[in-house]
Every structure is written in structure tokens, then in C-alpha cells.
């Protein structure tokens, strides 16, 4: 997969993705995800019987981190912080839309 390929879709909230699926969606090696997981930089992921499972929110977070690291040469900790801030911004925008409803 090339960096400029665009994948569009919707993930059900009760669906879980594997490490390999998230790595493919982020165009990274699984080792990239493991390093970030070990450092606690990707929330909404859990290990069940030694197998990592990722929610849709974890996928979005990982994709944002990957983009920030690639596009801005950000260190992983900064990329994680920015991904957190972008998630907060998305949540606030959704609340404003609901208020304007």
C-alpha cells in the first residue's frame, strides 16, 4: 500500500481489529505498533490472552500518530499528545453540532 492510498469505511463500535489489520491500515510494520503500545501511546487497545485487540478509536489514534510522525517528523510522544488533542477537538465539535441541532 502506498502512502497516498486512501481507505474509507466505517468500523462498528463493537468490532475489534487485530495488530496486523491496524498495521496495514496505518501502512506500518506491526513492530511500530508494538513499540507504541509498550510505551502506552495508543489508548483503546487491549491485550487478551497475549493477543492485541484494537477499537475503532485506537485505529484512528494510530493513523493520526503515523501521519504526524511521517509528515512532521514528530517524536512518538508528541504525536500521541497531538492525536489526543485532535480527538478532544472532534468531540467538542460534535457537542457543538448537537447543541446547534
Can you annotate each of these PLM segments?
Residues 2-20, 24, 30, 34, ...:
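Arg/Lys-rich, alpha-helical DNA-contact motif
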Amino acid at each position: 500500500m502506498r502512502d497516498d492510498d486512501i481507505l474509507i469505511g466505517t468500523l462498528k463500535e463493537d468490532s475489534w481489529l487485530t495488530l496486523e489489520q491496524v498495521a496495514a491500515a496505518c501502512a506500518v510494520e506491526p513492530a511500530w505498533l508494538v513499540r507504541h503500545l509498550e510505551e502506552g501511546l495508543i489508548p483503546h487497545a487491549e491485550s487478551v490472552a497475549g493477543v492485541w485487540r484494537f477499537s475503532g478509536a485506537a485505529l484512528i489514534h494510530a493513523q493520526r500518530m503515523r501521519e504526524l510522525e511521517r509528515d512532521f517528523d514528530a517524536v512518538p510522544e508528541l504525536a500521541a499528545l497531538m492525536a489526543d488533542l485532535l480527538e478532544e477537538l472532534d468531540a467538542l465539535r460534535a457537542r457543538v453540532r448537537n447543541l446547534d441541532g
